[in-house]
């Protein structure tokens, strides 16, 4: 078992420039050796022991060791072939829709619906409609109309048509009138609490038996703005086992000025009416929605039945449980207005804009949402899977640099100046090398202890003599890494003070991490990705006169 673990750990460490990831290695070992699944505890112990051996090796020593124990080459990566998701009863030219409320920009939850609808529209040579459902004026953020289209463009989603519901009120009025004429709907002026009490008991209210002629007159008064506190209700089954389905409302009075319509209209449709009308008129073949909409689907089926229309194929998928960032649009908006958040792309938020700012590539998010698919079971959003997919995309182009956060000054005596050359990328010789000049004064991140030996990565061993006024004093001890191994010396990153570049990294909690990078970091540009060794990947956001602002992406 030890030899197997050694090969996997060395492969992983060499791939990532001397920094093995034991969790990733555990997964690969179990994936390639199913017989070890009942020996996980034992495997964990072996990984821990082998990890200690590898961590004191230089990258060159790791490569030599791997060639000794696995001369046939590195362990080959194997991936399970995923079965591509299908749509039930799908034919060519499907018509799909993504229908958000423009209350803010899109967040991770929206990404699932938008990606899946786009995926199936492309798969079946169909059409994708963006429908902005803005019939509740209280929930509309004017700038969200444009933001949503920008977010979809970033995701790589091209819609064929954009529909705005607030521009279609006259259409909804026409179908509302027809329902009243057919005696399938009525104007109700009952007190909401009294109606609720009757509904719970399965008792029709007094308005239910009003004639269509009278209801049409009341309807005209509603449209003219002459009535308050009334609603239009759809006649369903007053004895339905689910009280919420009993005579649910389809129109309401709304006096709040609308961002697009102002005060021109006073009557607005509720979601179950407007959605049904639009899905029919737009020829929707399939509707993807969360299983929390199952009751809405049943409500909408009444409208399809009353008009004699064929309903689309409904697919209800499980809830996507997302832990971590803020997803509530109202909380985000309130926080932005109060100054708690810097904007819609604040690193603590779950918006697509925040993911973009942090360095998540749209291709990675798209891929993950397709993999999550349309399963009926609830799914926990796995950040590690998103990060892994993102890493596959950015790793090949991310130059490597040393970065020292919370820097401590170290003065080292007993050794003359020395230049070292390191690869910009372990697999990209075309990136060239980077140069570090040791001149006796460096920054380190680690808290060093007097009397202990440490190995400066790719350099030599030092012994700390004393720490005074926050400055660490040490002397050169030896070059040989075996000496460091014998003394169980930690290997630490370092940055020459003279050539250091100031860097501020903003993490996923919007906390600022101050530090320094090596001088060759100056070759980078805004929006580049780099990997700070033993720290993680970052996206360069801003190049300032006195340094850089970067956003932490992931390990």
From Swiss-Prot:
It holds the Pfam family tRNA-synt_1c. Belongs to the class-I aminoacyl-tRNA synthetase family. Glutamate--tRNA ligase type 2 subfamily. This is Glutamate--tRNA ligase. Its EC number is 6.1.1.17. GO terms for biological process: amide biosynthetic process; glutamyl-tRNA aminoacylation. SUPFAM superfamilies: Nucleotidylyl transferase, Ribosomal protein L25-like. It is found in: Cytoplasm. Its main location: cytoplasm. A motif ('HIGH' region) lies at residues 100-110. Catalyzes the attachment of glutamate to tRNA(Glu) in a two-step reaction: glutamate is first activated by ATP to form Glu-AMP and then transferred to the acceptor end of tRNA(Glu). The gene is gltX. GO terms for cellular component: cytosol; protein-containing complex. PROSITE patterns: AA_TRNA_LIGASE_I. Transmembrane segments: none annotated. InterPro entries: aa-tRNA-synth_I_CS, Gln/Glu-tRNA_Ligase, Glu-tRNA-synth_arc/euk, Glu/Gln-tRNA-synth, Glu/Gln-tRNA-synth_Ib_cat-dom, Glu/Gln-tRNA-synth_Ib_codon-bd, Rbsml_bL25/Gln-tRNA_synth_N, Ribosomal_bL25/Gln-tRNA_synth. The lineage of its organism: Archaea, Methanobacteriati, Methanobacteriota, Methanomada group, Methanococci. It comes from Methanococcus vannielii (strain ATCC 35089 / DSM 1224 / JCM 13029 / OCM 148 / SB). CDD domains: GluRS_non_core. One of its GO terms (molecular function) is ATP binding.
